[in-house]
Design a protein with these regions (language model features):
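Sec-dependent N-terminal signal peptides
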Residues: 4-12
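Bacterial Sec-dependent signal peptides at the C-terminal "C-region" and cleavage site
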Residues: 12-24
Length: 149
């Protein structure tokens, strides 16, 4: 019985890591399809074979420029500013939660057409890949971005 329990624990411990490795390989594969060229003013020009590739590159470049703003916009739209800024932001959170219901947003994502899901996935993946390639960046709250957010 102890051997079976030990085996189950090993399998359980390995599964998320395999999923994470698969996700990282997916990001790396998509990143290879994107070219970001910054001009003399630092403006990113993003090239990719598909719209999703360009969206992935856009979010990666935006995070390079100002990850803080990307994260704060997400936190605000999710009605979670008080978790970062404290009690003074409770009213802002309550107001946002009146307009945006995470359960409804997840449902809308699931019901979206495939072409739109690819864009939303690329949007989140570009941010997540940025965080993966820049471990020195410490998010205020969100360590993973989902496409429905």
């Amino acid at each position: 019985m102890k051997k079976l329990l030990f085996l189950l624990l090993i399998v359980a411990a390995c599964t998320p890591q395999n999923d994470q490795q698969k996700e990282i390989k997916g990001w790396e594969k998509q990143a290879q399809k994107v070219t970001i060229i910054r001009d003399n003013f630092g403006v990113p020009h993003i090239y990719g074979k598909t719209d999703a590739d360009v969206v992935f590159g856009l979010m990666y470049a935006q995070c390079e420029d100002d990850f803080n703003r990307v994260e704060v916009n997400y936190i605000n739209s999710m009605g979670r500013m008080a978790e970062v800024q404290g009690e003074s932001s409770l009213f802002i959170d309550l107001r946002m939660q009146m307009y945006i219901d995470p359960v409804e947003v997840k449902k809308e994502y699931e019901q979206s057409p495939e072409w739109l899901k690819r864009l939303m996935d690329a949007y989140a993946d570009g941010i997540n890949y940025f965080l993966y390639t820049h471990p020195e960046v410490k998010p205020k709250l969100l360590t993973r971005f989902d496409p429905w957010m």
